[in-house]
Swiss-Prot record:
Protein name, entry field: Probable deoxycytidylate deaminase
Disulfide bond positions: none
Main EC class the enzyme belongs to: hydrolase
Catalyzed reactions per annotation: dCMP + H2O + H(+) = dUMP + NH4(+)
Binding residue positions for Zn(2+): 102, 128, 131
UniProt source species: Drosophila melanogaster (Fruit fly)
E.C. number(s) listed in UniProt: 3.5.4.12
Residue span, CMP/dCMP-type deaminase domain: 27-163
Keywords: Hydrolase, Metal-binding, Nucleotide biosynthesis, Zinc
SUPFAM superfamilies hit by this protein: Cytidine deaminase-like
Length: 203
């Protein structure tokens, strides 16, 4: 049997896919925007689901949030629809906008008082003027968003006006990956007794 030199062995190992880093890993921006999208899945809003994620300069997630009613305000009692102005049954108190906390605001509130100065905000929908006020007040320096579908509405034009005035950068995130799949069956099911060490008990 021919002897394999150390140099040949190193050469063979270096050609193995397992000896190099995986190339299909998520880019940071895709990772954080995906976190926002996943957070949006928690929203009970039947029409609009928005998620947001705040990240510090070390690429650590500080807080996440999604649009929904304030804590302890029942999702089954408060209205999820928009009241139609001009209709005979118009009632402003039956409009969800009176009660919903936006994803960006929830993320900021969920930071539990931590300093957000210099952080980045990832959001699935461009922030409205009310959220822009909060973004500016807490010192978030950059906003990355997926959709700006309401760009022509005064609410969002006002948002951009404020962000521009104070130098908060905002840009649309262009994903490097169009699809990210979460498969809970990726990892084999573990023996529920294993974590308890029951398989090692001898009675």
């Amino acid at each position: 049997m021919a002897e394999v030199s150390a140099q040949d062995l190193i050469s063979q190992l270096s050609k193995s896919p397992e000896s190099h880093k995986r190339k299909e890993y998520l880019h940071w921006d895709d990772y954080f925007m995906a976190t926002s999208l996943l957070s949006a899945k928690r929203s009970k809003d039947p029409v609009t689901q928005v998620g947001a994620c705040i990240v510090d300069s070390q690429n650590r997630i500080v807080a996440i949030g999604y649009n929904g009613f304030p804590r302890n305000c029942s999702d089954d009692v408060f209205p999820w629809s928009k009241a139609k102005k001009g209709s005979q049954e118009f009632d402003p108190l039956e409009d969800k906008k009176m009660y919903v906390v936006h994803a960006e605001a929830n993320a900021i509130l969920n930071s539990n008082g931590m300093s957000l100065s210099g952080t980045r905000l990832y959001t699935t929908l461009f922030p409205c003027n009310e959220c822009a006020k909060l973004i500016i007040q807490v010192g978030i320096s950059q906003v990355l968003y997926l959709s700006d579908k309401y760009a022509d509405k005064p609410t969002y034009r006002a948002s951009k006006r404020m962000l521009d005035a104070v130098g908060v950068e905002y840009k649309r995130h262009i994903p490097q990956k169009k699809t990210i799949t979460i498969d809970f069956d990726t990892f084999p099911e573990e023996d529920p007794n294993a974590s308890l060490g029951l398989n090692e008990l001898h009675l």
